[in-house]
Amino acid sequence: SIRSPEGVVAGAAEVAARHVLAPPYVIKPATEGSSVGVRLVHEASNAPPLDLADWPFGDPVLVEEYIPGRELTVGVMGDRALTVTEIRHSHGFFDYDAKYTKGHAVHELPAPLPPAVFEAVLDQAVLAHRTLGCAGVSRSDFRYDDSRPGTDGLYFLEINTQPGFTPVSLVPEQAEHVGISFRELCAWLVETATCHG
């Protein structure tokens, strides 16, 4: 099974007025990607959870329990998990700048994890890809709280059905690590693409 953080969907006005979850938690726009607009609400913060004047994303708002620990990601190509990458960065989370600015994050692959956790992350990424009916390539993001025993600290955060494909993006890097060149990856995507209409 796949464990995910507790979460709610609420209106921006409701999130601005009160804590809809106990802090710490993460606020995300429902219609953005690449961590655009993501906010982290800390336990000790006395500020309103959300400033509507600084929230151009509208409704709905996704609010999720913040999971401490290590940031992991897995690319899935067809029905094959590529590898697990641990993302280390100086920001509070893997934000837009860390994702797309060279040198703002370190990608460690394969991630240094206990073997059972490593295999669980791979399996859960493939399970999410299949369960959601994804085709081609996806990338699943996880948090791993290694203070908890075994796989108890592993949480699935989200699946990206259109993961980045820049020179510093994770899926091309993982493919290269397992012996699939960027050219081969792109050719595979074109050759296996199907239209649904």
List PLM regions with ranges.
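Short clusters of hydrophobic/aromatic residues that line enzyme substrate/ligand-binding pockets
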Residues: 38-41, 96, 109, 165
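Phosphate-binding site of ATP-dependent enzymes
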Residues: 45-123, 151-155
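Conserved beta-strand segments that form the floor/walls of ligand-binding pockets within enzyme
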Residues: 3, 26, 62, 75, ...
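Short small-residue beta-strand/loop micro-motif enriched in glycine and branched aliphatics
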Residues: 35, 106-108, 166-171
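Active-site nucleotide/adenylate-binding loops and adjacent lid/helix of ATP-dependent enzymes
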Residues: 1-70
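ATP-dependent carboxylate activation and anion-phosphoryl transfer catalytic cores
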Residues: 1, 115-197
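Short beta-strand-to-turn element immediately C-terminal to the catalytic PLP-Schiff-base lysine
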Residues: 10, 38-44, 76-78, 145, ...
